[in-house]
Amino acid sequence: MKIKRKTLLVSIFIFVLVCNPIVANAINTGFLTNELPEEEQISFVQNIDLCLIESEPSKNAVVCFDVNENQMIAVGKKSSDRKTICIYSSDGTFQYGYTFNCSGDFGVEWDKDNLNIYFVRSDVVISVSPDGEILDVLEVTNSIENNSYVNHFFHATERTIGDTTYIIRNDMGIFNWVATSCSQIVIKDVSGAENVVYDVNSAQLLSAILSAIFILTFAIIVVTVIFRPVIKSMRTNKNKYDFCK
């Protein structure tokens, strides 16, 4: 059933492109964009193979997030195979999500109830409806303005909606320095009270400890390899000096 639904949505997108080659952009984004040729749009949609998911997958570390005016939280999750984006309500209840192919980093950006997904390596942004329909595909131009937008929006760890602030963070003490993603989503109200609505801190802490052990072990090996010949040479020279005495 899901395969038929996915095939139908892709077919609708291709049909709209063929029948309406010139249409107004459906995407409202902070990026400066250009139209992509129809063939490239169709190829991109087929390659990413985006699917709607209706049950919550396992929770992983957060690599990107955004919050819309209805306080729906889009969470991009860390994964090694297909990428996952899950949509949660403000109390942390799963609503729906998407999985898709992506060989690099990605970011999320709300456009009212639709979600924009930015594919960093491809320099492409797509608009996806809540039911998984791809509404538009645009090229993100290589510009100073877009680079600035990525740094200030997609790399930001806070979003403020009204009097409520949404924060992604780690709570692993000294091991925060090795984390490449975040383990918690916290909601802070106007009084400063915090409520954790998404938490994978325990799993992330174990990963951070293993990473720290690996980094320290590697550093020790490198230092040993570099300085061992120097120390050996110093000892040899000292022995020669003692012999001459």
Language-model-detected regions and their locations in the chain:
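Positively charged n-region of N-terminal signal peptides that target proteins for export
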Residues: 1-7
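Eukaryotic scaffold repeat domains enriched in small/polar residues
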Residues: 7-245
